[in-house]
């Protein structure tokens, strides 16, 4: 019969979680979400133009309508509607004027 304490794996899980978190942060900071514009030799992700003897590329860049702040309105609307439904569907127990009890 062994009186040794069971092995503590919490430090392994902590190191694994930190490594995965750091890997996700590095991946998220390096990934390119801009649309691919151009061909295999000419890349214009921020807008611009290119012209040579047999091809012409004109790209004006990402529009202001595609900003991440415009994507927040549906989320805010869903949260507001959910709160409104929850607040209106709560049973309100009113106090009786005559006996001061909830009915």
UniProtKB/Swiss-Prot annotation:
Main subcellular location of this protein, as a coarse class: host cell
GO cellular component: host cell endoplasmic reticulum membrane; membrane
Intervals, Lumenal compartment: 30-70
Any one GO biological process: transport of virus in host, cell to cell
Coiled coil stretches, renumbered: none
Swiss-Prot/TrEMBL keywords: Host endoplasmic reticulum, Host membrane, Membrane, Transmembrane, Transmembrane helix, Transport, Viral movement protein
Name this protein carries in UniProt: Movement protein TGB2
């Amino acid at each position: 019969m062994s009186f040794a304490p069971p092995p503590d794996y919490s430090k392994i899980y902590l190191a694994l979680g930190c490594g995965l978190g750091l890997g996700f942060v590095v991946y998220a900071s390096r990934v390119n979400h801009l649309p691919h514009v151009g061909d295999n030799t000419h890349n214009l992700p921020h807008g611009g133009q290119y012209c040579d003897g047999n091809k012409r590329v004109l790209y004006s860049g990402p529009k202001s309508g595609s900003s991440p702040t415009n994507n927040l309105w549906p989320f805010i609307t869903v949260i507001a509607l959910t709160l409104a439904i929850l607040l209106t569907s709560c049973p309100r127990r009113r106090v009786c004027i005559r006996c001061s009890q909830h009915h």
